[in-house]
């Protein structure tokens, strides 16, 4: 049986997130997932976050409570890839999260996209496996929270680009041929989580918001690292938090 026929909405899952974690009293309604250690360490240094729980999706990862502008957030790091990040989101929902915000990096498929831009995905090409266990098969999954997130960025006067993303499981098999096909379909970036987490969002009926940071580029015969100046990136990240 092909993986695209793996969705089973007729029977219950054998292992549920509540088998791994318990609901936490007064758990913040909004949870934030980040990938970069440097950004996470900055938050810890600036705001003195306290541990309120642990993620158990493969690794024991601390969850912290972040207090900012009289609001409380749960924040944790997640691993690269759709399966691990989907598992992390599942456990946060089981603990009590009502909304999830995910911030990560991506590779651009269009060299004309200026490095350092934030990107808001509007749809994700499902070149991974996790999403097919949560929703019916399709080439793309719509990011239903994209419109609201674009409005928020506009209100904050934060420049961004919106468009389709290519979600892949195979970091080292992003071939020139597949890159060109995704570009022809309108994809502007590639990453490894969007399709998976948006499938979780739809299945669990929990809004998940994602924005990305355009970093390296695949638009060419060879990979272009194209790293943005660290100080500029840090300033943009602080602006998002504020």
Which positions does each model-derived feature cover?
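Metabolite-binding pocket within alpha/beta catalytic cores that recognizes anionic/polar moieties
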Residues: 1-143, 147
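Glycine-rich beta-alpha junction loops
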Residues: 36, 107, 166-171, 196, ...
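Short acidic/His/Gly/Ser-rich catalytic and metal-binding motifs that mark active-site loops
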Residues: 127-129, 173-175, 217-222
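Active-site rim beta-loop-alpha module in soluble metabolic enzymes
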Residues: 139-184
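A C-terminal functional module that forms or caps the active site or interfaces directly
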Residues: 177-180, 185-209, 213-217
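His/Asp/Glu-rich mid-to-C-terminal helical/loop segments that flank catalytic regions of hydrolases
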Residues: 218-242
